[in-house]
């Protein structure tokens, strides 16, 4: 088996557009941990069932700092090693190296016998030189990783090097770092593992906060993801007649969108919510086992993940037959007005919380006007009230990027209590959810759930709706559906 193979290509790819952006990101995180070794794993393959793995997706911090997307690269680890000031990459404090398992020779057992990494099984793998050229990042064989991580580990007070680890990504790397810490501790039997967890958590926090403001390359990737997602919504409308005829019509809707995600992107950014009728009042309904019925609405919350791993996150609530009823339109318009109020305050200098508060003011006023609130809108909006949350229990916005709920480890003072800044990308997604079993409201409201969600880029001139090409108003939605169904 080892002979009579054509030569392996040694051609190296051009330097990727993302390479310079990823280098700047590494420099930024280097500034925060100048004398410490930083270890950021991509993560291992995850088992779905027995010997079948899920498709691989690297950890988002790893992807952000390397520029790698799609399914690159199981078990890889990015190590930023501290060096003398000014001697690091681009004059920084660290030298970065990407450790991964390169292609195996065709004379090796791995090539034809390893179903997880052998090229006979999974296709061509990159060489060290190819990734180095593509990423502008030094590479090394993963067999050298243990020495790279554990060398000189110890307490800085006695000349050792401290490590910070992106924890709970790869348990093998967790164990390697923990063992190195234990073996070099002054008093290993009384190690403060809680303090070490806090040390590592600061790295996760910093990596998360680094993504609060997107660079130009990231913004372009968000636009790619949004465009594919809009195309997926068009596919959904075209699939509605088949969905109505099927006993699990929600799955038909889900499947139509999934096909677009795989054709135009890498994958789904998250499990699609395709919620017909009363299922739309279940916030994370993704079983998608229900029917899609004429006269009802279907709430679809979906996003395509681009090959760069950046995802969109868009929600529309569509009338299945192409036209909203009077009650459906009434609820939809209230949610749309709340979204527009949130848009109006999504400007640089305002607090992130202001976006949610603006939407809640509109919804509380509308619920009071309809006679649904047991108190005034003012009382409901007070900290002691919150009665409106019976029908709108979630936040209006979250950051968006490599994760659908991006920057989740960022400190509250920079996220929820932070100031809106140019370059941020986040959602605006108010909703109203009136459950079938809610006896506090008149019957005509029940069984209707509406959410409208768009992806917003903050610029110096205010918010730009990246998903504006997907109709939002009731009239525009109806006209759009008629055009696609004609």
Regions found by a protein language model. Give the residues of each.
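Active-site neighborhoods and metal-handling regions in enzymes and metal-associated proteins
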Residues: 1-486
